[in-house]
A protein has these predicted regions:
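Conserved catalytic-core motifs of eukaryotic protein kinase domains, centered on the activation segment
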Residues: 39-41, 64-69, 130, 176-177
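Conserved hydrolase catalytic core segment
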Residues: 89-127
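Conserved serine/cysteine hydrolase catalytic core
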Residues: 132-184, 195
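N-terminal cap/lid segment of alpha/beta-hydrolase-fold proteins
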Residues: 1-13
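Catalytic active-site module of serine/aspartate enzymes centered on a nucleophile-bearing elbow/loop
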Residues: 188-227
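Conserved acidic catalytic loop of the alpha/beta-hydrolase fold
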Residues: 74-91
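Conserved HGGG/HGGXW glycine-rich cap/lid loop of the alpha/beta-hydrolase fold
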Residues: 12-65
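Structural signature of beta-strand start/N-cap positions in the alpha/beta core
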Residues: 26, 52, 89-92, 113-116, ...
Length: 227
């Protein structure tokens, strides 16, 4: 991918990498916790054959600015600001784990900018019982996963764009039945299991890409006018 570019979003400097044809449909990749945009190094070039791909370092990760506050609402606002500043429309958001939570919150907040979601191993908005790490950023984020805002279910129920939910099967540490239950609540949702654990895009990139490309073909399709 091209080198880091920096953009100011609400006073926070976010780094991102971009590749693919400038006029192609946009895809924004949102990494999981303890990762950064380089997590998509094998995925982004493949998607960039026919999409404009933006791989973002979320606040406090990679080359993006460290701040004194971290929450999913702030991650949501950062991504909304990113879409606004770059004027990205009809975007497919692809989020892994933490990035998936931010993605569906963005789709709820700004449905006019989001045409599709891919949620890879994304925890549902219910207590996860995860061990809280010492690392400051992870402590805030995991704390919210263990005590999520019940209003996040409103976001899940209200997302109207097509949603592909990918789960990693029994070797994942996330409760697979709860991921399936969340997937079933999206009005236009589809659930695919790729049984390689929590990091599907790393451990089964070909299967991941096949599922995402099929979803993108649907998300990119222009809406049929009603007569």
């Amino acid at each position: 991918m091209s080198g880091d570019q920096i953009i100011d979003v609400g006073g926070v400097r976010l780094a991102y990498r971009v590749l693919g044809p400038p006029a192609a449909p946009p895809v924004v990749l949102l990494h999981g916790g303890s990762a950064d945009s380089s997590a998509w190094a094998d995925i982004a070039p493949a998607l960039a054959a026919d999409h404009r791909v933006y791989a973002v370092d979320l606040r406090g990760h990679g080359a993006s600015e460290r701040t004194d506050r971290y929450s999913f609402e702030l991650l949501r606002d950062d991504v909304v600001g990113f879409l606004d500043v770059l004027d990205l429309r009809d975007v497919t958001l692809v989020g892994h784990s933490m990035g998936g939570v931010a993605a569906y919150l963005v789709a709820y907040a700004r449905p006019e900018r989001v045409s599709g979601l891919v949620l890879e191993e994304t925890p549902p908005p219910e207590p996860m019982g995860l061990k809280v790490p010492r690392h400051e950023i992870r402590r805030h984020i995991v704390g919210q996963l263990n005590a999520p805002d019940p209003a996040w279910w409103d976001a899940v129920d209200a997302v109207t764009c097509p949603v592909l939910t990918l789960r990693g099967g029994p070797s994942s540490f996330l409760p697979q039945d709860r991921i399936a239950a969340m997937a079933a609540r999206f009005p236009h949702g589809r659930l695919v299991t790729i049984p390689v654990g929590h990091c599907i895009h790393r451990d089964a990139p070909d299967a991941f890409l096949d599922a995402v490309r099929a979803h993108l073909r649907h998300a990119d399709r222009p809406a049929t006018p009603h007569h």
